[in-house]
Amino acid sequence: MIELEKHYYEKVFGQLKAHFNFKSPSQVPKITKVVVNMTAGNQSSNAKAIEAVLEDLAKITGQKAYKTVAKKSLATWKLRQGMPMGGKVTLRRQQMWNFLAKVLHIAIPRVRDFRGLSPKSFDGNGNFALGFKESIVFPEITFDKISKIRGLDVIIVTSAKNDQEGFKLLELLGFPFAKKV
């Protein structure tokens, strides 16, 4: 799984520096962290569902997840401030590269009817968000042992200044973006 990080430093780094005419190596965009988030959905009041979410996140990422809580109360969703909602994991350094390699080489190919990642999922600052509707695309989650199929969000935070730099970085790393029609 170290190959992705090696690929970045040996090939992608130089290509990005040449493509954008960066003067300093510190200007070249890099991935700084990956945030993986999963919610219990309408079962957020169920303590077992929250524990299952935290367990699934720990299995997928290899790092302990922590609970996320509601910031505001929303009566329509029967939600109170401070109520547990799901879990979140922030990955950096080697665990980040290992997880990204797993997403690229294992999870994305297992997605049904995959037509490419949307280039519109950038936030304007070079960060990319991608969602999986089913967590069973990861090999650590077995269909037999889960109570409910849940989705998860993966946010890739980069040091890019804009979406073009972030897009080029992820494209050169091998992320399969959908072609513009």
Swiss-Prot record:
Gene Ontology CC terms: ribonucleoprotein complex; ribosome
Pfam families per UniProt: Ribosomal_L5, Ribosomal_L5_C
Transmembrane segments: none
Entry GO MF terms: rRNA binding; structural constituent of ribosome; tRNA binding
UniProt keyword list: Ribonucleoprotein, Ribosomal protein, RNA-binding, rRNA-binding, tRNA-binding
GO BP: any one term: translation
Cited function: This is one of the proteins that bind and probably mediate the attachment of the 5S RNA into the large ribosomal subunit, where it forms part of the central protuberance. In the 70S ribosome it contacts protein S13 of the 30S subunit (bridge B1b), connecting the 2 subunits; this bridge is implicated in subunit movement. Contacts the P site tRNA; the 5S rRNA and some of its associated proteins might help stabilize positioning of ribosome-bound tRNAs.
Assembly notes: Part of the 50S ribosomal subunit; part of the 5S rRNA/L5/L18/L25 subcomplex. Contacts the 5S rRNA and the P site tRNA. Forms a bridge to the 30S subunit in the 70S ribosome.
Family indicated by similarity: Belongs to the universal ribosomal protein uL5 family.
Protein name, per record: Large ribosomal subunit protein uL5
Organism per entry: Mesomycoplasma hyopneumoniae (strain J / ATCC 25934 / NCTC 10110)
